[in-house]
Amino acid sequence: MYAQKGVGFIISDIVRREDGTITSCFMRSDKEHHSFAVFLNDAVKLDHNCYETENWNDIRDWADHFSKSRITLWWGPGRHGPGDNLFFMVSDPDGNSVELSAEIEIVGADRKMGTWLHEERTLNYWGKGMLRVD
């Protein structure tokens, strides 16, 4: 994978189906769990942009801001398995998915790659997960 070999990203976690097919790969370039991720999907596209906030209170405040602007959260708030971060998703005016996230896992340089099962709970501990493929 170019992101790993060409750029130098380190794989933090992968998500696999029971048959072993990789459906997601989370990579890091610093101490945060991931700064880049790829997802198996039926279409070749940018999945989403993510913007980081500091903490749960920021997630709340941003959700309130979007509510006052009549922008609906279409996923979340929730907590991802890989990365253990808080999140929610909205759509921008062009229909692109935008994630706001906080409190992502901080990892040491010696952290081994983890493997997660491809299931809704992996993508959202608190509720419905958004599986890109079955």
Where are these regions (language model features)?
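A short beta-turn/loop motif at secondary-structure boundaries
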Residues: 17-19, 41, 79-83
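Active-site beta-strand termini and strand-to-loop segments that position acidic
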Residues: 27-31, 41, 91-93
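Intrinsic, low-complexity N-terminal interaction/targeting segments
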Residues: 34-37, 78
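Core segments of cupin and vicinal oxygen chelate
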Residues: 1-33
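Long, positively charged, glycine-interspersed low-complexity recognition regions
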Residues: 114-117
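Catalytic core of non-heme Fe(II) oxygenases with the double-stranded beta-helix
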Residues: 39-53
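Short beta-strand micro-motifs in enzyme catalytic cores
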Residues: 23-25, 47, 84-88
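Vicinal oxygen chelate
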Residues: 1, 5, 51-98, 102-108, ...
